[in-house]
Amino acid sequence: MTDVMYNPEIISKAGVILSSCFIDKKVDYVITVETKGIPLAYEVARNLGVQLVIARRAAQVTEGPTVTINYVSGTSGRLQQMSLSKKSMKPTSRSIFIDDFMKGGGTALGIKELLKEFNSDLVGIGVLVDNKQVAKKLVDEYVSIVELKAVKESSVIDIRPSKMFTKK
């Protein structure tokens, strides 16, 4: 996944695709969680002409006062933390969450809860890869570019274009 996430040509194109899904949402911020999702989120923010905000797994002293929440990982069920500087966002803003990979949706749900602390709305979720091996997600509405259907023992990965590319 790292070879894809840090390839500027691929991420630039993926950023165009995802930003086109949210162009009419009147977004104030693109938010992501450190670290692998940052290049994709940056491209989406750049295309939409809005600020990128990065939530951290642990608060950094250099960021000043922060808001920290606990959330449950959608796949492992483990309790995790997410922090965001109080200066990162204006209240009553509208944000989209962009990430590299969605397993169970726990991180997306955590972002939604974190944004509530800023009186801000999560108006969309976009990911590069949606892991379809996890059937029940903690979030219902999101877009993905590709779907991971299966990883076989022989290291063969079954990845297909997401439903946004298939005719209905």
Where are these regions (language model features)?
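PRPP-associated nucleotide enzymes
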Residues: M1-I98, M102-K168
